[in-house]
């Protein structure tokens, strides 16, 4: 519930005070350990955090679940000396604890499914045993203030104090803008160099960098948030520099101008005398389907050429019963796609659609046709 004016500011200030107090009780200074075969190295920690981020998307869980799992993992590794061979089991146990703490009951993954689909290399019973060890070491206290909690609070205070903050981003609502910052924060949480800062410092540095891009008076608002959070300005400057470095590396790693091309199944559209389409095998290669459908298809980068070869109209030949059954199944498949995109036209439009597509293909000389929705009857 959002309160108007001063009441909203008081509520946000109260949330910030409680979160900072909670963080002060839980947070421990990160002491870098000498990498050996007997303890978890910083790079191994970053790899397992990135793995948890992938699990978050795989099981369609909240960002808060990943943030809490990451915080629990760091708290546990700061308390005990863990062997690297147990790291996956520790991480998946923290992930399961976070899911049970944050998610709704129907969204919590089934333990057997989680152990199987995550490829963690441990059984359900091993996860439960490790879960009990983690709870004992953390004194059964899982409710800690995560960097994502502080990001929500700082962003709400900034938007409330500076309503013009998002004027330069008219297409983004405050929640959409927060989602962009959340994605950046989750990336920074997988960087062990930022473990030297509290979660509140990390969130404020990210909000401050974003305000610097959007409004000219970002510095007074940053100082105001800094005073409310009772932080050291020199640490904030150092944290801003590291966050800016890691975010610049993230932007440079993104693919440029990625184009996702949809190719239909291995069939060609052929016109018939009655104004209907027939499906025949084509040399156009369609997508390869394997047993593992969980992996996304690799995007095609740069100019991509594809054609729908439409031979000249000819008389429709009598097909066998098996061919008719196959055509009915494919027609049902395409009917489902048309209904999904609200392109379910009546049969009277078949001839006009055919003529339009033929003229478009004949008149377009470029090997790369414009990316437009294609209606397949």
Curated annotation (Swiss-Prot):
The keyword Cytoplasm does not apply. GO terms for molecular function: cyclin-dependent protein serine/threonine kinase regulator activity. It holds the Pfam family Cyclin_N. SMART domains: CYCLIN. Residues 356-377 are annotated as: Disordered. Keywords: Cyclin. Residues 367-377 have a biased composition (Pro residues). One of its GO terms (biological process) is regulation of cell cycle. Belongs to the cyclin family. This is Cyclin-I. The gene is Ccni.
């Amino acid at each position: 519930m959002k309160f108007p004016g001063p009441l909203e500011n008081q509520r946000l200030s109260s949330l910030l005070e409680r979160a900072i107090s909670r963080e002060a009780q839980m947070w421990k200074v990160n002491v870098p350990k000498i990498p050996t075969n007997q303890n978890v190295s910083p790079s191994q920690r970053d790899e397992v955090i990135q793995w948890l981020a992938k699990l978050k998307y795989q099981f369609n869980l909240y960002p808060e679940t990943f943030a809490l799992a990451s915080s629990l993992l760091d708290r546990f590794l700061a308390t005990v000396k863990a062997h690297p061979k147990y790291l996956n089991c520790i991480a998946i146990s923290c992930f399961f604890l976070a899911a049970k703490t944050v998610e709704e009951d129907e969204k919590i993954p089934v333990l057997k499914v989680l152990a199987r689909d995550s490829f963690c290399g441990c059984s359900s019973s091993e996860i439960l045993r490790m879960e009990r060890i983690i709870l004992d070491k953390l004194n059964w206290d899982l409710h800690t203030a995560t960097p994502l909690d502080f990001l929500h609070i700082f962003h709400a205070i900034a938007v409330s104090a500076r309503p013009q903050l998002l004027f330069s981003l008219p297409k983004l609502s405050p929640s959409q803008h927060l989602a962009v910052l959340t994605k950046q924060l989750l990336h920074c949480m997988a960087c062990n160099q930022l473990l030297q800062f509290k979660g509140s410092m990390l969130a404020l540095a990210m909000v401050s960098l974003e305000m610097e891009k959007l409004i000219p008076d970002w510095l007074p608002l940053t100082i105001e948030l800094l005073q409310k959070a009772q932080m050291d300005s020199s640490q904030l400057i150092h944290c801003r520099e590291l966050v800016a470095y890691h975010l610049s590396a993230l932007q440079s790693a993104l693919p440029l101008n990625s184009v996702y091309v949809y190719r239909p199944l291995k069939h060609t559209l052929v016109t018939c005398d009655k104004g209907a389409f027939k499906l025949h095998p084509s040399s156009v290669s369609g997508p390869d389907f394997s047993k593992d459908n969980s992996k996304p298809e690799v995007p095609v980068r740069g100019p991509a050429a594809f054609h729908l070869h439409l031979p000249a109209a000819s008389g429709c030949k009598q097909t066998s019963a098996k061919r008719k059954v196959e055509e009915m199944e494919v027609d049902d498949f395409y009917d489902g796609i048309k209904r999904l995109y609200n392109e379910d036209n009546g049969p009277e439009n078949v001839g006009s659609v055919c003529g339009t597509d033929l003229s478009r293909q004949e008149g377009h000389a470029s090997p790369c046709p414009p990316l437009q929705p294609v209606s397949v009857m």
